[in-house]
Structure formats: C-alpha cells, structure tokens
Amino acid sequence: THPSKAILENLGIWQRFPADEVHYLRAASVLNGDSPFRLHFPVPTQNSHRQAIDTLGYLVPNHIIRRAAYEAVQGQENLRWHTGRRVVACQSDAGSAQVTLDNGDTISGKLLVAADSRFSFIRRTMGIAADTHEFGRNVLVFRLEHELSNDHTASECFFYGSTLALLPLTDHLTNCVVTLDSRKAPELLAMDGETLANHIAAQVGHRYGAMKLVSSVHDYPLVGVHARRFYTNRCALIGDAACGMHPVTAHGYNLGLQSQEILSRLILRQAGQGRDIGDPALLAAYDRRHQLNTRPLYHGTNAIVKLFTRETPSAKILRHGVLRLSQALPPLKHLITRQLTG
C-alpha cells in the first residue's frame, strides 16, 4: 500500500529495491463463480491527503524486501546479529527479558520483541494466548507468462471450490495464488507445467491468451492467527506473531509494517525521555493501537472467506448480492480503496 511504501522509504529500504522488481497495481477486480459481473476498483485521482496518485498499490517480491531490509541495517553500530540461531527459551522479570539461543548464549534487554512468525515460539513460551483458525485449505503460488496483457489489474476470482488471485507483475507476467481444499491440493501439485497453465487459462476464460508456467510451484497450508493481546511483561509481538492474516486481502505484510511502526515510535519517544522502554503503559498503548488496526480486518476477512468459500445455493446468491451491493455503494468502495492509497 502507499502508507507501507512511506514506512519503507523512511527506513531506507524502498530505495534499495531494483526498479524492475517494483510492480504497479493500476486496478483491481473481484469476480464470483461463473458470473460475468465484477466488482471493480480503479485508481483514484488522488489520495486522502489530496496528493495525485497513479497506482492502487505495489507488488514487490518477498526476497527483494528481505534483502533490502538486511542491506539497510548493515553498519549500524547498535545492532548485533545472531544468524543461524534459534531461540530455545525465554523469560522476563521486573527489570529485563532474556532469551537463550540453541548454542547456549543468553541475551538480555529491557524489551523482547517477538517477530517469529504466526507460529511464534516466543508468543507461546511467554504465555500469550492466540486464536488460531485452520482453514482446511492450501495455498499454491507460482508465476505464469501469458500472451495478452493483464493491464496491471489484479483479479480475485472466487470460483466454486477454489479461489484464484492474479497479481500483475509485468504486462505479460502474473503471479498466481490458488487457494483450495487441502485434500485437492495434491491434484494440482501433480500437474506438469503445461497442464497447470492450461488449467488456469481455462478457469479465467482464456482472457490472457496462451499461458506458460515460468517458476516452481510453492505450496503451504493456510492458518490464520490473532493473538488475544500483543504484549506481556517486557515482551511485545509484531508482524505475524501478532496477527497472521488470510492472504485474500493481501494486507498481512502491511499490518506487519504498521505494528513495527507503532511500536518503534512509542519506544523512540520513551527512550528520548530517558524512560523505561519496557514500561507496561507503553506496551498497553501499543496493544490498543494495533488491535484497532488488526482485529476488525482479521475477523472481517475471515467472514468474507467463509461466505465466499461456502458452496450452498443460498451462499452463492448472497455472494452475488454482496458484490452487486458493494458496486452500488461508492462510499464502501472508497473506504476499501483508501486502505490501499492512504
């Protein structure tokens, strides 16, 4: 999103992205089953700050972001790396938090920040409860080249039995994200490249022309997680350790950036005043602010997923009605667009 870009620029990360790895999202559409109707989100002429914009958002490969983030902090004298290590124990007391690594080293500090995935070991060990949602679905991710242009338009296709997200990279290269029943995933994984590409082409009515698989296929089970609170004594959760989203809204990474932005601002202000950065009041303030960001979006997304993955006749009618109503309500579309553009 545009706010996420601003955060990454402020951290000196965005500037390190190769220009050809930053892909622009010009529009987005949502489709339901085999209906020709689509909910369309064009690029607004300006954001909420009345600044001119020409894109809904940006697509940048994960490995590019990780590499740029690593490069951006090289040379910082106040940073110490412990690469290739794993946390095997952690605890906190009135004055500090400590972690023990798998090589026996112990590290202590005023505040422990956990960013160790939605399956966070630190979250569990520190006694922070989390609500976990097993979707019973797998996600397959791969890239397809295609004959006709994608017009830099993302499409979220809620078919009956599976969901297909098409994320435009270049005009003739698209990242595909297939979500389907975990029991059916092996069938797609067993397909050769040509068969898989033809399968996707047929699903979208051949509107991209001939398609060709140009990457490996990555597969993982889909689990959503939301911690009931984002802190405990001298420990705070950020990123997926705090909230692991369903990918349908593509907001997981954006929420992760927001979490570190909120927490880091509070820490910098506290440190600037010479006060304890592990103060419970600071951590409670972080929890309140980030819960407001994540909780409505997490549960709202899960409700949308539940509706658009049910195959009953009544659900199919309701799905179509929801899209029609959304198209007819400009304020709702504006609210969704504003989440992307700021």
Predicted segment positions?
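Glycine-rich FAD cofactor-binding loop and adjacent beta-loop-alpha segment at the N-terminus
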Residues: 1-25
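Acidic-histidine catalytic/liganding microenvironments
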Residues: 11, 76-77, 329
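Conserved N-terminal helical subregion
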Residues: 20-125, 133-138
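Pyridoxal 5′-phosphate
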Residues: 92-96, 150, 256
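FAD/FMN-dependent oxidoreductases across multiple families
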Residues: 186-270, 276-278
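C-terminal helical "tail/cap" subdomain of flavin- and related membrane-associated enzymes
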Residues: 265-342
